[in-house]
Swiss-Prot record:
Accumulates only in meristematic cells. Expressed in inflorescence, shoot and root apical meristems, as well as in developing organs such as gametocytes and seeds. Also detected in cortical layer and epidermis of roots, leaves, pith and vascular bundle of young stem, young floral buds and organ primordia, pollen and through the valve of siliques. Not detectable in mature root tissues. PANTHER family: SKP1 (PTHR11165). Pathway: Protein modification; protein ubiquitination. It is found in: Nucleus; Cytoplasm, Cytoskeleton, Spindle; Cytoplasm, Cytoskeleton, Phragmoplast. It comes from Arabidopsis thaliana. Involved in ubiquitination and subsequent proteasomal degradation of target proteins. Together with CUL1, RBX1 and a F-box protein, it forms a SCF E3 ubiquitin ligase complex. The functional specificity of this complex depends on the type of F-box protein. In the SCF complex, it serves as an adapter that links the F-box protein to CUL1. SCF(UFO) is required for vegetative and floral organ development as well as for male gametogenesis. SCF(TIR1) is involved in auxin signaling pathway. SCF(COI1) regulates responses to jasmonates. This is SKP1-like protein 1A. Pfam families: Skp1, Skp1_POZ. One of its GO terms (cellular component) is cytosol. GO terms for biological process: auxin-activated signaling pathway; chromosome segregation; ethylene-activated signaling pathway; jasmonic acid mediated signaling pathway; microtubule cytoskeleton organization; negative regulation of DNA recombination; protein ubiquitination; response to auxin. Part of a SCF E3 ubiquitin ligase complex composed of SKP1, CUL1, RBX1 (RBX1A or RBX1B) and F-box proteins. Keywords: Auxin signaling pathway, Chromosome partition, Cytoplasm, Cytoskeleton, Developmental protein, Ethylene signaling pathway, Host-virus interaction, Nucleus, Ubl conjugation pathway. Belongs to the SKP1 family. Residues 102-160 are annotated as: Interaction with the F-box domain of F-box proteins.
C-alpha cells in the first residue's frame, strides 16, 4: 500500500503532491489533516511555488533522515552529522529566498525550519557593527546622529 498523498497548492496556482508524512512536518497542515480539511488540496496563499518547493525539499529530507535514524540506531551520530551538513548546504541561498523561507516556515509552523533560517540570519549579524549590518541587509540609516547616539547609550551593554 502506498503512503497517503496530500496536495499542496501554492499562491501562484501550482500544485505539489507530497506524502502525508512530509506534509505533517507543518503543524499548520497537521491541524488541517486532523480537522479533515485536506481532501480538495491545501491552499497556501502565503507561499509561492518556488518557496513551497524548497520547504518540501527540506521536509522530505528531514522525514527521510528520521526514518533512517529509526532503522539504524548505531549510525545515528553519522546521520545527524550528515543532516547538519545537508542543512548548511540547504541554507546557501540568496537573502530574498532566505527571508521568504522564514515567512513560510512561520506561516506553516515548521519549527525546525524556522529555527534553521533564523539562526542563519543571526549568524549573518553576529560580530558585525550596525553599519556592517545595514550594508549586509541593504538597510537605510534613517537615524539622526543624535538619535543614533541615544540608542548607543541606552544599549551600551550590547556594544561591550
Amino acid at each position: 500500500m502506498s503512503a497517503k498523498k496530500i496536495v499542496l497548492k501554492s499562491s501562484d496556482g501550482e500544485s505539489f503532491e507530497v506524502e502525508e508524512a512530509v506534509a505533517l512536518e507543518s503543524q499548520t497542515i497537521a491541524h488541517m489533516v486532523e480537522d479533515d480539511c485536506v481532501d480538495n488540496g491545501v491552499p497556501l496563499p502565503n507561499v509561492t511555488s518556488k518557496i513551497l518547493a524548497k520547504v518540501i525539499e527540506y521536509c522530505k529530507r528531514h522525514v527521510e533522515a528520521a526514518a533512517s535514524k529509526a532503522e539504524a540506531v548505531e549510525g545515528a551520530a553519522t546521520s545527524d552529522d550528515d543532516l547538519k551538513a545537508w542543512d548548511a548546504d540547504f541554507m546557501k541561498i540568496d537573502q530574498a529566498t532566505l527571508f521568504e523561507l522564514i515567512l513560510a516556515a512561520n506561516y506553516l509552523n515548521i519549527k525546525n525550519l524556522l529555527d534553521l533560517t533564523c539562526q542563519t540570519v543571526a549568524d549573518m549579524i553576529k560580530g558585525k557593527t550596525p553599519e556592517e549590518i545595514r550594508t549586509t541587509f541593504n538597510i537605510k540609516n534613517d537615524f539622526t546622529p543624535e538619535e543614533e547616539e541615544e540608542v548607543r547609550r541606552e544599549n551600551q551593554w550590547a556594544f561591550e
